[in-house]
């Protein structure tokens, strides 16, 4: 008989000492005690610490009493909690969704026209769910038929009342920050779980017995156990199930990603209670996500999948960036290489765009976390492998700053450098750990006359706040100026650095992408009339049906209004609204596109354009008098 296999499982990423060794079943089916394993097979592997199901019945086939979900609460109104709550409320009008946060200013912003997060399409979705809609009609001229659209009652609330918000919920989702730890054991590597711990304690105090607690935050593998233990400590007589449901949305395209996700991942125990909890959460997403895209796994697999997904996306970026350095020496064009390898169906074309590197709050943090877990498990080769992804990223941004220095003859004194783009990617106002701030810090050390920054999606306050965290020296910080338009930014500049690929900066100009419209209403007149006569696809049209109806009534129009069906209720700001008094742009493209011919007339020689995102055509810009250097290509390419 095979001997038991010992394996180590990460319980928490907070310290190297929090490791527990458990005995796993061998491949031959023996238990730790050496007796035959009679536990039933299940459709997925167990989490290491979950209780085993009865040996007489397969846990995955136990009849489960469905859990009715009437109320959901999100703890945390940030980049994950706010948009996810809005989309769930939008697609589930029968469920009351509450988002609670201790930050009163953030909650007030969610309850105003000035949302704290800039995501394309999000304001309209929030308004529909938060404020409700008017009864309206839509006329379809092709069939000469008027469709009646019923009003909708509000079902999305933002509040600072944690006790009532959590207490009423059938499902509570924890959506708080898990930044890299800055102190003690694991500093600079593992995740700081203090916010998750605090949120779990709050949930334990107020949640009703039987509530499902969902970890939505990105966490080290094994964090669900910590949450489970906190719940048991505070409420030992209550029964809670902890489920993992990591988010896979990308900032800048969050609404699109939530509307049509590649997958929804739900991790739970394989006990009857765990499966029941997973089924309840699955039912919420089933309001608009096909069942084939909702994957159920064990808790630890779910937690680890999120880290691995981000690490592998970052790995692709670093891989192509490493090749870009070779291209510049060999005379090859990295964009042509990207097209060549991206055409291989085994590789695909996504995340193969060479640039100045990746930033943001996720990729670097999650790779550090993954590497730290490997190090704790004594898998040093694995840890070093993933750290190499970050080494290339740091090398790429340092290489870019050095390129700017060389292009200006090794001297920035008395010169103005313009920065186009500060957000870590286009389509968002998130400035956390942006590539731009690292480049600016290096350039500021060269004592230029001015570093002028313009980003069409960020307010000056947001940019200065992030810069101030990285540059504390007052004389150096005084060199940095944030401008609200590209004209002020480039006037008198010797060089422009393009660091975020907003469409505003492209040359030749690139039209904003528009989604290809498809609709159930695109059929023949007879089919449309039949659909209309049935009462608009049945008595209870979904929001997806209404989106399709909007597409139908606006087809052929050059300019599509925000609210073609006139469903939205008017928004009003309170007196002395802080949002109205704050200068900001928006992530859908505030400001006009850059007129490069006008820029050329305003700049000083040598009129350098350092294109860190390969969004301009060097030959075309050079016709206007610029000298252009891109990423992964020779001068003038």
Residues of each region from the PLM?
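Structural/interface elements that position substrates and couple domains in central-metabolism enzymes
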Residues: 2-637
